[in-house]
């Protein structure tokens, strides 16, 4: 597989298909792979499940995919700044799997490490635990959470090399490292090669 591409569109060539799961790095709008998201929008791929810290804003980040109606499901921990996202969820046009932030990070890490699931106390006894397996450990209730795997992971790194090693700096070191590992394929946009 070629390691360096002329642009984001070329990097995603041959990887995209309707109904796929895409995990995208970033925290809020910091460290998001905006060029790869734009290439995904331009591809017209639809019925996507998108996984990330948030749903972007109306005209940037993952919000661009929502605006073009390419998404069927969102798995995220924060969704409060995107009016189109809110409209689609309330109208029943979009499925939402709201996941606590730490749990989402661990689900991504677990998926990347090949761990199918883990138990956590987070969300125990809440609506988020409904329909999930629960167990008692040391007299406390724990909820089973499954690891997340994606068909493609897209991230933004400060630096990368031709072997695929990535360096994330400062706030961009948020969800990018975990998301980089959870995809069958990872594509990144780096500032330096």
List the model feature ranges, each with a label.
Residues 1-193:
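Conserved alpha/beta enzyme-core scaffold
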